[in-house]
Amino acid sequence: MVRLPPLDELAERWLVIAPMLLKATRRTGCYEPIDLLKGAMSGRYGIWVCESEAGIDAAVVTEIVDYPRKRILEMMFVGGGNMALWLPEAIRVFDEHASSAGCAHIACLGRRGWARAWGGAATGDVVVVRGLGDVQR
């Protein structure tokens, strides 16, 4: 089951969810899991859980972003395991969520494997990250 839990449940289960998001947040260094929880509590982010009978298998952080000409659902972070169990349902749930929120599409910044896992999704531009002072000439 893929769902957006109520905030009180999210807080109660945070000690299970936070470690799942840690590896993903460390890739960018821009967020820690607690930053995502604060954002969820303020209504900025959605932190979804992907569950099986064994408990929470994964967590997905989303944000609806309004640009001047379109609204998109950004998949910010995904962490956890057992992807084969929840990914097909997650694609359906997030497509429905994005559509009902008036989004034009879903976007994510992630490793290349996500394009394959997402099933036929096209990749866009390359994101170039350069630390200040790291210019090589």
Label each PLM-derived region with a short phrase:
Residues 22-23, 27-30, 68-77, 129-136:
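Long, low-complexity, intrinsically disordered polar/charged segments
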